[in-house]
Amino acid sequence: DDTDMERSTEEHQKNILDNLRWLGLDWDEGVDVGGEHGDYKQSSRFERYREVAHQLVEKNFAYEDDGAIRFKVPKDETINFKDFVRGDMTFDSSDVEDFVILRSDNSPTYHLASTVDDVDYGITIIARGEDILSSTPKHILIMEALGADLPNFCHLPLLFGPDGKKLSKRHGDTSVEAFRDKGILNDAMFNYLCLLGWSPGDDVEHFDREFAISKFDFNKVLPNSAIFDEKKLLWLNGQY
């Protein structure tokens, strides 16, 4: 996701990938390992997004509006999908306004770029924060207009600080690098992050990646916001 040309830099991208690898995560396709879908950068796919936007206009699913293109939301319809964490979800299309998919400068919005990527890449599970939940009906409408099969959805709870407010700069530097510099081990950080909103059961708290992979189930993730407790992280780090 590098459509914001001012904020998206090679250094920023490298930092994200380095942090993921430090946590012990890897992937089969991506910007640094390649794959069958090009370089996996949205900035390289602008022509594809424009092509899809104009296809939607031709099929009367979208229309031009002052240089931009808006998706035409059908009225009085229900949009249903099953969420692994939140169960059956239903939205009334009348509560969703026509939304921009291509800006007047020909750049795609998040709704268009992410949805087209999910369709083109054959994504089967979309796991993201619950703050994106309200966007999901829009993405489903685009997918249906494109005649694509719907993936499974999973909207994960956000992380909150001990004060009950969403984790942010007010809670200090909570970046992966900051904890790494404090001496937090990657195994401990991975272990602790797994416990935020999920548990393998039987009061087990200390486990490795292989154990987490064997036990993890999206359906067992709690919908309630998880509290990031640095004291608990430090305790767990001591176990390693």
Region spans (language model):
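Catalytic adenosine-cofactor/nucleotide-binding cores of aminoacyl-tRNA synthetases and other
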Residues: E6, G147-N152, L156-Y240
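Short linear loop/turn motifs
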Residues: D32-G38, A68-K72, P157, V204-F211
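Internal, well-ordered alpha-helical segments in soluble enzyme and binding-protein domains
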Residues: Y49-V52, G67, P108, S135, ...
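Catalytic cores of large soluble enzymes that bind and process phosphate-bearing ligands
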Residues: S8, K41-R48, V73, D131, ...
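N-terminal Rossmann-like or analogous alpha/beta NTP/dinucleotide-binding catalytic cores
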Residues: D1-A68, S93-S94, S135-A148, A188
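A generic structural motif
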Residues: D2-D4, D120, Y240
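Active-site cores that bind ATP or allylic diphosphates and position pyrophosphate for catalysis
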Residues: Q42, Q55-K169, S175, P200
